[in-house]
Amino acid sequence: MAVKRARGKIVRRLGINIFGNPKYTRLLGKKPAPPGKEHGVKQRAKVSVYGEQLKEKQKFRFAYGMSERQFRNLFAQAHRMKGVTGNNMLSLMERRLDNTVFRMGFAISRVQARQMVSHRYFLINGKTANIPSMRISAHDVITTKNRKGIHSIIRHNLTLSQGQRGSWLNVDEEQLSATVSELPRAQDIHPVGNIQHIVEYYSR
């Protein structure tokens, strides 16, 4: 996995629950200050423009579980595409299979979704898919393997849904499957930060 640092410290440093797991929201409620600044800190220190851009980049990179190299390559690809670079980045990140599983409500976090994909829980158009970073396409059909243990986990996760489901997905909770009705658009996505800051960061 690209992100190996302590997730609790990352969440506290960035000041937002980027991983989706409710336990990190509770952690921020108890310890809102960044690590190492727990005592006597009333508010977060002001940062430079560069520092703010870097912080926003880290929000997205950690949220989607990407290495710096993967993230830079994604920016380069988005920049080559037609349209607005920031919007293209959002769409490409949302199209990752691990994120799609998360948006389906089948996992409570992208971290869990990544593990489920790696353990071969899912099929795309009838073929086993085990690469978290692979991108889904319009009209793809994502199904789960017919195993009782897998279905039990997913049905439990569906009861814990945090309202993160993607509007571009048609989810069948009975069959535990989903169809990609269209590619995700920027207006359909609730980003974890300011995507324009990332464009500015890499355009320096």
From Swiss-Prot:
Question: What PANTHER family does the entry give?
Answer: 30S 40S RIBOSOMAL PROTEIN, SMALL RIBOSOMAL SUBUNIT PROTEIN US4M
Task: State the similarity comment.
Answer: Belongs to the universal ribosomal protein uS4 family.
The biological process GO terms on file are: ribosomal small subunit biogenesis; translation
Q: What does this protein do?
A: One of the primary rRNA binding proteins, it binds directly to 16S rRNA where it nucleates assembly of the body of the 30S subunit.
SUPFAM superfamilies cross-referenced by the UniProt entry: Alpha-L RNA-binding motif
Q: Which InterPro entries match?
A: Ribosomal_uS4, Ribosomal_uS4_bac-type, Ribosomal_uS4_CS, Ribosomal_uS4_N, S4_RNA-bd, S4_RNA-bd_sf
Q: Which CDD domains match?
A: S4
Please name the HAMAP family in this protein's record: Ribosomal_uS4_B (MF_01306_B)
Q: Which gene encodes it?
A: rpsD
State the GO CC annotations.
small ribosomal subunit
Example GO molecular function = rRNA binding
Q: Which keywords label this protein?
A: Ribonucleoprotein, Ribosomal protein, RNA-binding, rRNA-binding
Describe the protein's quaternary organization and the partners it interacts with: Part of the 30S ribosomal subunit. Contacts protein S5. The interaction surface between S4 and S5 is involved in control of translational fidelity.
Q: Which Pfam families match?
A: Ribosomal_S4, S4
Which SMART domains does the annotation name?
A: Ribosomal_S4, S4
- The residues covered by the S4 RNA-binding domain are 95-157
This chain's protein is named Small ribosomal subunit protein uS4
